[in-house]
């Protein structure tokens, strides 16, 4: 699976490079929520997502090695179990994440080619819905794995409040995971009923709301845990 993940990331970059050869120097680079072009930029901006995918692919490999090494070398059973759990979570999430982001890159490439012909896939109802569904699926994926992460400094919903102790970490990551899943599902469902251009807008609103509410909840959990420790002391 790890090898397949790297192959997909490399294929995404390869296809992007092939398309770039046929594109002019300046291409549509930014769209509003209705899919209309609002800015033109260098065609090499299309390389951003494929490069990020490759970095995520190889970065996840080093993270897996880090967690596996920590699980083998630590003398604490608790830390060993946490490292093994984080390695498992990372191994589960990286493939579907790479696949979804590669699909998003494919949509962007297709839309760029159409935009140069005076058309736009993203400005159509189908394009808006497809992109919203892909981003919504990514939120659902991330939200599902957040509660499975154990306290660490590399992956998860990491704030100074959430990392205070295992209780604040577990409660905050579980809540943030639920909020992201809800945002993704609401976005996917909303796009079935929303007019053209509103799918991505609604998903962006849901995502921002989920993040803000999760941060506030993390602060509340941290305050409650500090108060509980003071009462015990």
Predicted regions and their residues:
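Feature 926 captures the class I aminoacyl-tRNA synthetase adenylation module centered on the KMSKS loop
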Residues: 1-233
């Amino acid at each position: 699976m790890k090898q397949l993940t790297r192959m997909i990331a490399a294929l995404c970059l390869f296809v992007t490079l092939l398309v770039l050869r046929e594109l002019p120097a300046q291409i549509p680079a930014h769209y509003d929520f209705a899919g209309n072009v609002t800015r033109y930029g260098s065609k090499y901006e299309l390389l951003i997502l494929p490069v990020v995918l490759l970095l995520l692919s190889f970065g996840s490999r080093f993270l897996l090695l880090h967690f596996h090494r920590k699980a083998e070398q630590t003398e604490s059973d608790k830390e060993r179990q946490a490292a093994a759990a984080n390695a498992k979570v990372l191994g589960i999430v990286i493939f579907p994440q790479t696949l979804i982001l590669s699909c998003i890159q494919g949509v962007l490439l297709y839309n760029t080619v159409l935009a140069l012909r005076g058309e736009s896939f993203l400005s159509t109802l189908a394009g808006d819905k497809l992109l919203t569904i892909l981003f919504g699926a990514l939120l659902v994926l991330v939200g599902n794995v957040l509660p499975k992460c154990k306290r660490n400094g590399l992956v998860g919903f990491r704030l100074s409040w959430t990392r205070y102790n295992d209780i604040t970490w577990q409660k905050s990551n579980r809540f943030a995971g639920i909020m992201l899943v809800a945002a993704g599902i609401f976005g996917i469902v909303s796009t079935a009923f929303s007019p053209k251009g509103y799918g991505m807008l609604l998903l962006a609103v849901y995502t921002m709301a989920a993040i803000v509410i999760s941060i506030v909840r993390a602060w509340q959990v941290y305050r409650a845990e500090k108060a509980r420790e003071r009462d015990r002391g």
